[in-house]
Amino acid sequence: MCALFGWLDYKGIVSDRLLKKLTQALANAAEERGTDASGIAYVKSGKVTVYKRPKPAHKIHFNAPNGTRAVMGHTRMTTQGNEKFNYNNHPFYGHADVNFAFAHNGVLYNDKELRTKRHLPNTQIETDSYVAVQLLEQQGKLNFDSLKNMAESVRGSFCFTALDENNTFYLVKGSNPMCLLHFAQLGLYIYASTESILKKALQKAGFHKYPFEVLHVDEGMILEIDRYGFLSGSTFEVQESFRFGKWYNWYDELEEEYYTQQEELLLEMCSCYGVTEEDVLLLLDYGYSADEIEEMLCDSNLLLETLCAVRCEEEFCCE
């Protein structure tokens, strides 16, 4: 699990001080999904700039220069590629018809296959996410068509963001969560991977006092927001993407269980939160979604209360 976060200011009426406070608040709140590395990207004097470090966000002072009109951020929980080598961390630089920065929340499992099949150049970057950047660079464009091609080529769980040198922001929504808000009065878009990140950050930075609209972003959507705040969209075909799990109930009937990529990642990473696979499977079987379980992992009290309630109900039903 990682987190994406950021904002785009298209009116220029929010003070630089408040926007810097918002950036840090978003980054700190996004630690709930990753503390191995943190980074942001922004445009300075017409050039894309990336600042990232192998540290949790609260130990980094994010200070985009005055006049910055968009910030794209990421907090990382390492799955592939050692975070101690900073080139493995997000955001990444990309070069097509425009220079851009790129970030990913999720896990891609066909990155090595794509590098061979598409004859992508060798790179020291070990992170699975970087293959998406290479696919865009190979096409030589950053637009709806190239993003669609990339999204339909990769396999795994994902939500991608990109920010180009013109302060145009792109969002590609796969199976991983994303929340996008529009503050029309302020001329400001703010986004983060989860609602809980946004709630914490808006409260901390004081933006909860202003009216906003929740923009629903569905799986298979590609959004573009330009520097004037104009939003346009396209779509891509969602690919079936799962792996097979364990065989069980051999004494009754051989049955094959499979999970979505987001559920698989929960099963892989749950031990980092002191939770067993059995606990996660119990919640999934009970009907909780992967997004709901992710929220619980970040709130240990809620998780323990829910597990206790589910177990008590199961024991009652078995009596």
PLM segments and residue spans:
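Conserved short alpha-helical segments that host acidic/polar catalytic motifs at enzyme active sites
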Residues: 1-319
